[in-house]
């Protein structure tokens, strides 16, 4: 079974039914005889540019790819905190990964990288002043919700 076949099946699944978690996706694939680890599914979700919404995983339309971070942040971002050169984003449970991927896709030059958990994103800036600027930028998004 190839990567492209597995990813094609993932797209068919999310187009046909509500898939809300990676566990649900893994179970659906398993029922089709396709075994995939959580790491593999995370990569597939990133490669396919899927976003996790309240209605489950969805494909991101080409025209949505630019402003997607603003949209996701507006819907799921709850708090922005800073500790030296690190900015911590709190999101609704289960949405940190999709918000982090969208932020990564923005390619902000002041962001070195991100690490996401279930409801927390660690945004790494090169230094404290840059982290302060990132925090202000993100707080601006919170204020416009």
Swiss-Prot record:
Gene Ontology CC annotations of this record: cytoplasm
InterPro entries according to UniProt: Arg_repress, Arg_repress_C, Arg_repress_C_sf, Arg_repress_DNA-bd, WH-like_DNA-bd_sf, WH_DNA-bd_sf
GO MF, any single term: DNA-binding transcription factor activity
Keyword set includes Calcium: no
Keyword entries, A-Z: Amino-acid biosynthesis, Arginine biosynthesis, Cytoplasm, DNA-binding, Repressor, Transcription, Transcription regulation
GO BP of this protein: L-arginine biosynthetic process; protein complex oligomerization; regulation of arginine biosynthetic process
Metabolic or biological pathway: Amino-acid biosynthesis; L-arginine biosynthesis [regulation]
Disulfide bridge partners, by residue number: none
SUPFAM superfamilies from the UniProt entry: C-terminal domain of arginine repressor (SSF55252), Winged helix' DNA-binding domain (SSF46785)
Pfam families in the cross-refs: Arg_repressor, Arg_repressor_C
Predominant cellular place of this UniProt entry's protein: cytoplasm
Lineage: superkingdom: Bacteria
Subcellular location: Cytoplasm
NCBIfam families: argR_whole
Family stated for the protein in its record: Belongs to the ArgR family.
Function: Regulates arginine biosynthesis genes.
Protein name: Arginine repressor
Origin species: Solibacter usitatus (strain Ellin6076)
